Amino acid sequence: MKGRIAILLLTAVVLTATSSIIPAPAEYTCAGDARYKTEALSRPRILQGSRAGKAFRTRVSGLPRFAQEEAYELTVGTCGATIRALTPEGVFRARQTLRKLELTDTSRLCCTIFDYPRYEHRGLMIDESRSFKGKEFIKKELDAMALLGLNSLHLHLTDAAGWRIEIKSHPELTERVAWRIGYTYTDWEAGGYKFASAGDPDAYGGYYSQEDLKEIVAYAAELYIQVIPEIEMPGHSMEVNRTYPELACIDASGRRRNSSWDLCPGNEGTFRLLEDVLSEVIAIFPCKYIHIGGDEAVMRDWPSCVNCRARMEAEGFTEVRQLQGYMVGRICRWLQEHGRTAVGWDEILETGLPRDAVVMSWRGSAGGEKAAAAGHKVIMSPNTHCYFDYYQDLIRKEPLAVGELTSLHWVYTYDPGDDPHVLGLQANLWCEKVPTVQHAEYMLYPRLFAIAEIGWSPKSRKKDPVEFRARAHSLLDALRKLGYNGFDMDTESDFAIAGLRRTQKGEIIYPSF
């Protein structure tokens, strides 16, 4: 095995101008050995729309609409830089490339770059329920996302561990379950899942006011990043049932049941609450997508619930799990009536789903492939490659995490495929084990660089993990100078550098492209 690792680790890397840019552009050419001065990057000439020229417009005309809008041509010469693009967004992407050249390009070779994204959706999810970090953290990560060409931030705002969004029609949600006893999720769990009020000296938590969220949305819009809010249902909803116990399932004896943290799909009050919440959510977030969760509903209380049984009888259902399909379908239709499109984790596909709903595949890629075959739009986010709460090096070297070894090399091997239903991909940072801003950035960088390159760079560009690692190291050094934390690539184990994994039986899994 040592010999195999040695081959995979073959280095002797020399950074060139191309290797300084992440994500790698579609086309890059150098103008001989002429070199530019840094000042040449500061005030580019902008040729936008019709001024971009017939040659550029013709060149991008065959691209998908989203790619045309983000496409640009950047020429950097001894006398300055010129940007050609159809839209302000294309100009913005070119400016971000100029910034990366300034941060990481040591060659200073004059060059021409023609560039556009491979996928429409290039995203990051941050779990704010389990560990609340606040708007300044979010804005800081938005800056990094923009530098990487990412264009979608998914905020996981509600879960059992805390409700993080102000709902003015239901202030109890933030008064009662935005604060808890336990700094980390593990502490809260060990202490018996206790909530607290904001004034409690032992309370940990917080929430976003609607003004906070509008500020985040506006900030993201300036960076051409959409913000997708997630309101979990029907599972992962203990905090809602704690706030409104009258909405929990009820058995034949009249006893309220909430053993599985699920909302009750038989209670009309559940839908009134969700519609109230979503009405305020869509007023805050202009994004066409609203994430409704849909994962890991346990359904333990539904079979004995008189309201759920009545719903099943009224709808002609023969299986309890059809109640999840009822709830998801009803909320999807409500969102559609209000001009929005529902997104949900891949479980929503299991019990029938309106055609316009988007499926986010997390349990590997199979759910996404099935959804695409059924005609649904898909965002690939498999836990095998895109879960950044997983270890990124050997367990003995790393802070407490979950899951399998998911190194930079391993993430870089992923490809979402070419099915036209696939909108793109997304990294997910769940925060049960990630309580601080510094820890979050440690888990994100440099692995998020790989997601950015997979989402942007053309498939025709052959992947070279050694060359990519060199570019990642350079960009990570630049981010550190800007005040970001990150994984220590200098101490990464040979096992992780080679992109290896070990099965539960101890067998070695080698990366493949």
Predicted features along the sequence, with ranges:
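Flexible, acidic glycine-rich loops studded with aromatic residues
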Residues: 342-347, 352-357, 363-513
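Generic recognition of stable, solvent-exposed alpha-helical segments in well-folded globular domains
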Residues: 137-140, 208-215, 269-276, 322-330, ...
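Active-site neighborhood of glycoside hydrolase catalytic domains
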Residues: 240-246, 250-357, 362-374
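Acidic-residue sensor for enzyme active/binding pockets
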Residues: 70, 230-232, 296, 347, ...
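Feature activates predominantly on carbohydrate-active enzymes
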Residues: 23-24, 67-289, 330, 334, ...
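Flexible loop/turn segments at secondary-structure boundaries
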Residues: 132-134, 160-166, 234-240, 291, ...
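Acidic, contiguous N-terminal accessory segments
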Residues: 2-12, 16-122, 341-349, 353, ...
